[in-house]
Amino acid sequence: MRIHRNFVALGIGSAVIALGVSCTALPDAGNPSEGSVVYVSADYPEYGSIGAAVDSADDVVVVEVGPSRQAIEYPEFDDSGTDLENPQSGVDISDEDLEAMAVVTTVTTVVIVEVISGDLEVGSSIEVSQLGGMHRGVTYIEESTTLLETVDSPELLLILNDFGDGKYDLVNPEEGILVVSGDGIDSLPGVGGHSDINSLQELRKRS
């Protein structure tokens, strides 16, 4: 289990709070009006192969996708220690700063069909968080993210980080989702292929 997902959000107050991804909205997205679209940029680790992504993950599972909901995530910070030990020590974050650093996410419920690796159980449901979604009439789009609910496949292979308290996200938005067709697995349409592993059977033997 990961101790904490850690993304960096840059807010109006220019305080930087360490929460794996670095995320910031585009500079002109300050106060978007209802009906507008805001593009969010995020940096994720890249693995270059399915095998490397699987090795980095806490859980690798085949799932059926269920309903989703919108959520707002706020950065958390640790102000313990001295200024030299911890750059967050002594940083005064106002409610306005915290609101400016909030990130819109889509949280999707998935049902576990098969466990390739990890501690999850077949038949259980978990929630997977992805950047982007809609909030107050504004659509937020993270450029490399394909929301689970939009993928046209009855089953998906998800390569997940576990942050505890039932919180999961993909190791990255492109390499963390694979389309399942029978025993075969493939990258999302438009995503460069990582052909080192092409089937669930190969994954089972590897795990």
Predicted regions and their residues:
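N-terminal post-signal-peptidase region of extra-cytosolic proteins
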Residues: 41-51, 86-97, 136-147
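Mixed-charge, low-complexity intrinsically disordered segments
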Residues: 71-107
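Short beta-strands and strand-coil junctions in structured, solvent-facing domains, enriched
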Residues: 71, 116-118, 166
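Netrin-like (NTR/C345C) domain of secreted extracellular proteins
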Residues: 2-14, 22-35, 96-98, 122, ...
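OB/S1-fold single-stranded nucleic-acid-binding modules
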Residues: 2-59, 67-84
